[in-house]
């Protein structure tokens, strides 16, 4: 049991250390209740608000909703210093 726990802990530590400095994990299809938090506390927040066939149709950048202006893969990237 202890060996399994240590193995899982090692895998988690490996994933965290392979992350780029200053980058948090991307989140696909963010929930609406996270929007206010991310846009308040992150210097740069980009949301895919309406994901259609893997593409972002409506995008929110900073605090302004831009409809049908950007089309890119549906992910949310939270960069600390960009």
UniProtKB/Swiss-Prot annotation:
Residues making up the signal peptide according to the UniProt record: 1-28
Source organism, top-level taxon: Viruses
Glycosylated residues in this chain: 62
Keyword Metal-binding: no
Sequence intervals crossing the membrane: none
Conditions for induction: Expressed in the early phase of the viral replicative cycle.
InterPro entries assigned to the protein according to its UniProt record, in alphabetical order: ASFV_fam_110 (IPR004848)
Keywords in alphabetical order: Early protein, Glycoprotein, Signal
Family per record: Belongs to the asfivirus MGF 110 family.
Function: Plays a role in virus cell tropism, and may be required for efficient virus replication in macrophages.
The protein, known as: Protein MGF 110-5L
Record organism: African swine fever virus (strain Badajoz 1971 Vero-adapted) (Ba71V)
């Amino acid at each position: 049991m202890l060996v399994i726990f240590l193995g899982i802990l090692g895998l988690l530590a490996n994933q965290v250390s392979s992350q780029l400095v200053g980058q948090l994990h991307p989140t696909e299809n963010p929930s609406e209740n996270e929007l206010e938090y991310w846009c308040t506390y992150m210097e740069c927040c980009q949301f895919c608000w309406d994901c259609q066939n893997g593409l972002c149709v409506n995008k929110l950048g900073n605090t302004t909703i831009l409809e049908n202006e950007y089309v890119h893969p549906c992910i949310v990237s939270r960069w600390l210093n960009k």
